Amino acid sequence: VLGCMAQSLKHDLLENKPYVDIIIGPDSYRKLPEILNRENINNSIIDTSLSRFEAYNDLFPKRNNGVNAWVSIMRGCDKFCTFCIVPFTRGRERSRDLNGVLLEVQKAVDDGFSEITLLGQNVNSYKSKNNKFHNLLEEVSKINGLKRIRYTSPHPKDMSDEVINIMNKYDNICNSVHLPLQAGSNRILKRMNRTYTKEQFISLAQKIQNRLPNVGISTDIIVGFPGETNSDFEQTLEVMNAVKFDFAFNFKFSARRGTCLLYTSPSPRD
């Protein structure tokens, strides 16, 4: 069992899945050939250590016959939202080298792909040496033959004026922004550790709409977060009415074992 599932469910796998011989987390993949080449595996092999440095810099996926290529530019997250397991399964933030990203994008274009989606658990917190996300976005935009560029998922706290300016400057950057709100109540946002208020979020969304005419804005909403009241939910609706999102991904809260918040208030059922 490999990847995030191995990272988050290793104890359950050990206790209840005796047929599992190897449990490897997402940052231990380089050891896999050595492990598989062992003649005998008599005991379970487990390696779920997380690295502060592993950024998958030298791995270029093989792509065939497509339009959109997904290109990971960073891994992990430092935000520690209380509902999210990503920092515990993917580790802390680390970014790929800018030149490595550009080489992968260029190879995808050479292979016939016309659209690129830049990926990261917190994509706009990208930082490699002196380059930030807006620097990378601009360099990718200059690649000949690349018709469309998207990126996901950004964090509102890291959405900078520089990113908005670059989006406005280059026609091949799609005029759309995914801006996860999660909740519209400041009390719930604080419990979620989202590090912004609803007023700051509305101001950011309106700035994006003013500076990027006809921009499409989508969002994520969590409903039924522990302790959420009807009043809290009504405030979420107020933000949605103020911003007028083009699309919203709505999710009922579900607890993730191992997240940093020990919930003491029950999750609303209705």
Task: Go through each PLM region and give its residues.
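Conserved SAM/AdoMet-binding glycine-rich loop
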Residues: 8, 110-230
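Anionic group-transfer/hydrolysis microenvironments
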Residues: 74, 180-184, 222, 254, ...
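Conserved N-terminal phosphate-binding loop of PLP-dependent enzymes in the Aspartate aminotransferase
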Residues: 145, 244-245
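Catalytic cores of large soluble enzymes that bind and process phosphate-bearing ligands
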Residues: 24, 93, 97, 193, ...
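Hydrophobic alpha-helix-in-membranes signature
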Residues: 86, 153-155, 225, 254, ...
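Conserved small/polar residues in nucleotide/adenosyl-binding loops
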Residues: 263-270
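Short beta-alpha connecting loops at secondary-structure transitions
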Residues: 190, 261-262
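Proteins enriched for Cys/Gly/acidic motifs involved in redox and nucleic-acid/cofactor modification
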Residues: 1-124, 177, 199-210, 234, ...
